[in-house]
Amino acid sequence: MAFIISIIIAYLLGSLSFAVIVAKLMKLPDPRTTGSGNAGATNMLRVGGRQAAFYVLLGDAAKGLIAVLIARFLNVQGVSLAFVGLVAVLGHLFPVYFKFRGGKGVATMMGVLLGLSFWIALFVIATWVIVVSIFRYSSVAALVSAVAAPIYTIIAGRTDYLFPVLIIAILLIWKHWENFQRLRKGTEDKVKL
């Protein structure tokens, strides 16, 4: 029963689109219809600046972390705990409150990983920061981080988390597919940090 309750909470928390919420609170354009059209922190950086992007990043990561922490509190463990994190990411990608139009899941994945394992999260976040600092493309950083997450999970010895983390990575790569096509064509926007 604790697992089912955790799954429901994770999806409902994941469905909170902080890009849309922050845009409304700060009287900014809807990120789903402005910039890249993505309800995420990188697009909010373009649409509303650093402060708006920071709030979105914090909110999107926090909901993933909180979903996993609630499940931990309810004594959900191992692969079941990682599946709760996956559902939080699915909520972000397909939010019930916002007609199933969500973001791409990078910040939420990082929050989920932080709830699962501090060290895995630390290495994934460090990977994202290093890659975006070098290449200035959020999508490249997302790709490398998504590929790295299952690898770091194996290195950390948390093979019980591996399958859900692998699914999260595949979902993130799929959600960034258009970005990768723009990268190939040379039309992808760089991130201005």
From Swiss-Prot:
Subcellular localization, as worded in the UniProt entry: Cell inner membrane
An annotated GO cellular component: plasma membrane
Annotated membrane topology: Multi-pass membrane protein
Membrane-spanning segments: 2-22, 51-71, 78-98, 112-132, 154-174
EC number from the UniProt entry: 2.3.1.275
Cited SMART domains: G3P_acyltransf
A molecular function (GO) term: acyl-phosphate glycerol-3-phosphate acyltransferase activity
Broad enzyme group: transferase
Transferase among keywords: yes
GO BP term, example: phospholipid biosynthetic process
Disulphide connectivity of cysteines: none
Superkingdom of the organism of origin: Bacteria
Catalytic activity annotation: an acyl phosphate + sn-glycerol 3-phosphate = a 1-acyl-sn-glycero-3-phosphate + phosphate
Pathway: Lipid metabolism; phospholipid metabolism
Keywords, alphabetical: Cell inner membrane, Cell membrane, Lipid biosynthesis, Lipid metabolism, Membrane, Phospholipid biosynthesis, Phospholipid metabolism, Transferase, Transmembrane, Transmembrane helix
Similarity remark: Belongs to the PlsY family.
Chain's role: Catalyzes the transfer of an acyl group from acyl-phosphate (acyl-PO(4)) to glycerol-3-phosphate (G3P) to form lysophosphatidic acid (LPA). This enzyme utilizes acyl-phosphate as fatty acyl donor, but not acyl-CoA or acyl-ACP.
Subunit structure: Probably interacts with PlsX.
Protein name per its UniProtKB record: Glycerol-3-phosphate acyltransferase
Species annotation: Coxiella burnetii (strain CbuG_Q212) (Coxiella burnetii (strain Q212))
